[in-house]
Amino acid sequence: MKIKKFINKVAGATMCAMIIGTTVVSVNVKANAETSMKTTEALDTHVDDGVAGILEKDDFDTQDEYQKYLEKHPQIQSQEVNMASRVSANKNPKPKATLRYKIKGLPRTAAIQKTYIGSTYIYVIQRSGLDSYLSRCVINGSNAVYKDEMKLQNFGHGQTLEWFEYNGIAYFWVTCKANETYKEKWGTQIGRLKYQAGQTIDYTQIPRFSHLSYANKSGSSIGSVKRVDAALSSNGKKILFWVMDNTGEIQYSFYNTSKLNAELDKVQSQSSKYVPCTTSEVKAACTASFRQSGSNRVLPNNSFQGVELSDADSIYIIGGKAQDKPQIAKLTGSGSNYKYEALATPVHDNFGNSAESEGIQLKGDYVYFGINDTSK
């Protein structure tokens, strides 16, 4: 990816921002199986993890690849039709998006999967095979110029990069532990990472949460984990775990971040730095959870490219592959009761057939999102 853009613009009751190519774009939308695990396993994985499941649109690099797969597997095509999201939003705004930042000087052209916009720096994460690269870019007006990076080994593919401070130290929540069963190498765990310029670190070297199939109030498994992501509320008090299993079912779980950080502190200095979501302490930190399956899943453009959580517990989901117009869904509610409040379709001249949505961030009154221009 050579251009990433962020767009930032108020448009009535809806606002947008975005990232395109090696540019960053952002948008802000304001619209009014089931088996309990008895013991902790010796490894940081569930026995079913890595079991291949259905392939969906996000498992392919291009729409053409996905279409060819469906043509070769007609039985899969009918299954995917049944699973396609059919839930309807209460509102369908079309906010105008505005270019906000352009990322310059990145040493590699891989797509930026997620950005974090701070006051001085923009951090961007790119995947290369099983590994990821986390780069720090200095903000200078409407540009952000590459400064340094760290290599994240075996972290896999994720859209999680949530900055926070804990005990006076700056960290990121990130997706980690690549799922090698899938071409996209989806991440299957959520970890706490300290940025260290010039360093190479393996996912086993950071404290993290494993067994995310059990990340819920009941302590029951959703099944074999395919991919996970997370979203931190703006005030840092709550974190949302988003988990998809290999059948496509999705689990949303809300946690008290102070309690989760306390659990990670316990393993920080140990050789095995994972905390299973099956422990009583992690279960107690879960405040609510719910699931979506089949055509009831909220997947804009039948795609998931990132999630965010507001202080008011609203959930924002961005979706769209190349050839899709970016869409942002907003779910409102609390606990396990949510409604599909809005589906926004941001408007911008650069949203052509080669634009792919990448990541989302809430910042002030705006929602920032990335657009990867695959033609660059």
Describe the function of each predicted region.
Residues 128-131, 168, 177-183, 245-249, ...:
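Short glycine/acidic-enriched loop and turn motifs that connect beta-strands
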Residues 69, 74-105, 113-154, 320-342:
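Beta-propeller domains
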Residues 85-105, 143-155, 198-225, 264-300, ...:
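Surface-exposed loop and turn segments in beta-propeller and other repeat-based domains
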Residues 286-337:
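Loop/turn-rich, solvent-exposed surfaces of beta-rich toroidal or solenoidal domains
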Residues 104-119, 157-175, 219-240, 299-312, ...:
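Structural signature of eukaryotic scaffold interfaces centered on beta-propeller domains
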Residues 139-179, 348:
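Blade-loop segments of beta-propeller domains
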Residues 132-142, 185-201, 249-274, 325-337, ...:
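Beta-propeller blade signature
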Residues 21-40:
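Sec-dependent signal peptide cleavage junction
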